[in-house]
Amino acid sequence: MSEVFTHINEEGRARMVDVSEKDNTIRQAIASGKISMEKDTLERIKEGTISKGDVLAVAQVGGIMGAKSTSQIIPMCHNILISNCDINFKFDFENSEIEIVAMTKTVGKTGIEMEALTAVSAAALTIYDMCKAIDREMVISDIMLVKKSGGKSGDFERVGL
């Protein structure tokens, strides 16, 4: 791993990295996160009885919109073409939580990790927003990059998950 901060110039000021000379390559990233909640809230999401509607359907759209908006909310992110974004949810009744997994893909000059992380974050925030009227104890946690492939820096896969 490089110890050079690529988003800082010689004067110590923030900058966007110039990727114009880089090759287009297939790049993919997977990120995950969790939102824990009261057991009744989890049951109501699964049963589809939340008054605002189908929580996971809306969260899926929110996650995709988040991925598409990454360059507008993360200052030094490039605006890249996202060729695929898929959001999945896994119910964990034992721990009273939903795991959110986002996969993003592009063919481009820079990575797509931030889009995957933003997709998970936006999906979790959407779940929170749709359920906050009945559960203010929800906690969003463990948002992380799980895997990435493609690009000059090589592949990464988190171990121990």
UniProtKB/Swiss-Prot annotation:
Name the SUPFAM superfamilies on file: Molybdenum cofactor biosynthesis protein C, MoaC (SSF55040)
Q: What class of enzyme is it?
A: lyase
The positions flagged as active site in the entry are 129
Q: Per UniProt, what is one GO molecular function of this protein?
A: cyclic pyranopterin monophosphate synthase activity
Q: Which InterPro entries match?
A: MoaC, MoaC_bact/euk, MoaC_sf, MoCo_biosynth_MoaA/MoaC, Mopterin_CF_biosynth-C_dom
Reactions that this protein is recorded to catalyse: (8S)-3',8-cyclo-7,8-dihydroguanosine 5'-triphosphate = cyclic pyranopterin phosphate + diphosphate
Q: What's the protein name?
A: Cyclic pyranopterin monophosphate synthase
**What would be the name of the gene that encodes this protein?**
moaC
